[in-house]
Amino acid sequence: MRKYLIINADDFGMCHSANMAVLDLFQSGCIHSTTLMACCPWAKEAAALCHQHPEIHVGLHVTHTAEWENYRWGPMSSQAASLRDEEGYFFHRTEDVLYQANSEDLMREMQAQVQWLRKQEIPFTHLDNHMLTLQNHLIETLKYCQEEGFSFRLARAKDQTHPQTAAAIAYADTHGIAIIDYLNPNSDRFPNDRYTYASIRDSYLAMLAHLPEGVSEFFTHPAVESEELKAIAPDWRVRVGDY
């Protein structure tokens, strides 16, 4: 079996700094795809960049959280009460979504984000999930992907001792939904206060040197260094390092 590698930039549309990094990386030939956060304030700019630069291969980064302290966003669906915190935004943490959100609202919100991206008239082929908020609803998510013709970020090499994961992988394979074989650890593993560019560079190079046979995906969170990014994201150094 041959080795294949997908390098994806998550969080397209999150902020202007992320958008500029994604555009530059595509133009430099450094990434293969990106996934767009439709509910974020800079999603319209990201969509415009896709029209201006057709080389950008985009998917949807299905989002149900707004993790930053002072930079928030909320549901696109008008029927998503269980996804909103007391201020009307998405919850900060995945744990709160898993505890509070019901399946119907999660699916409605995913569909609303898909519909928004379609209205931008941007071709897109794949979905993935911001902060794993769909981890308890994988079969429902895959059924939707099957109906709509999307692939989904789910790795066959994940720990299949979790019944939902094993069932989801089997469902994808049985129904012809394209998934990957391996999802490689990325810069999320590096705490901001202990991060160095050399540490993540060496980690990526080591993973590339030992890439397994099959389809692997690296997902990154690149952003251009800016005052905007520093004001938004405590992990800004890691994001700049990904860029």
How would you label these PLM feature ranges?
Residues 1-6, 16-126, 136-243:
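Terminal accessory/targeting
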Residues 9-12:
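DG-centered beta-turn motif at the end of beta-strands
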Residues 131-135:
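Gly/Ser/Thr-rich loops at beta-strand to alpha-helix junctions
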